[in-house]
Amino acid sequence: MRKLLLLGAGYGNMRILLRLLNKDLPEDIDITLVDRTPFHSLKTEFYAIAAGTVPDSEIRVALPEHPQLTFVEGEVFRIDAEQQFVELGDGKKLQYDELVIGLGCEDNYHDVPGAAEHTYSIQTIGDSRQTYQTLLGLPGGSTVGIVGAGLSGIELASELRESRPDLKIKL
């Protein structure tokens, strides 16, 4: 059996799965998908969770099901490329023949002093929930600074204007 190990249930690995599982997948291939959550998240919508305009249940997408696909919930602790295995946070080791690493990205603070220490993230559902809770607790008239004016920053500012018109928002 050949083992394909996919790390991360983000857009990249979902695309790989859809392409492989919608074709005649050779019987000698087993696919294992590892992610910290048992669903795919529409990451481009995390700003709406942070702003409180959409519940996180609306941006969860069920993972595909297939007899040759196994899902493992966990966090990657270590990758041993030489021995061809991935160790998860709980100590479980997963062997592979082919590995795809699609674990997402990290926040970019654009060299803004203090941003790394004093900001909240919307990179994960958990981060977005925490950001929402913090924003919810702000008194009216508070100023919210958004570091980064890319798509997510603009979307967050727009949604915050809708959900919290009492806040001052700066990009």
Each language-model region and where it sits:
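FAD-binding core/adjacent interface of flavoenzyme oxidoreductases
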Residues: 1, 68-145
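Beta1-alpha1 glycine-rich phosphate/pyrophosphate-binding loop at the start
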Residues: 1-70, 145-146, 155-171
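Alpha-helix N-cap/helix-start capping motif
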Residues: 10-11, 125, 150
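Glycine-/small-residue-rich active-site loops that bind phosphorylated ligands and cofactors
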Residues: 12, 78, 152
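Short, well-ordered, mixed-charge alpha-helical segments that flank or form enzyme active sites
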Residues: 109, 151-155
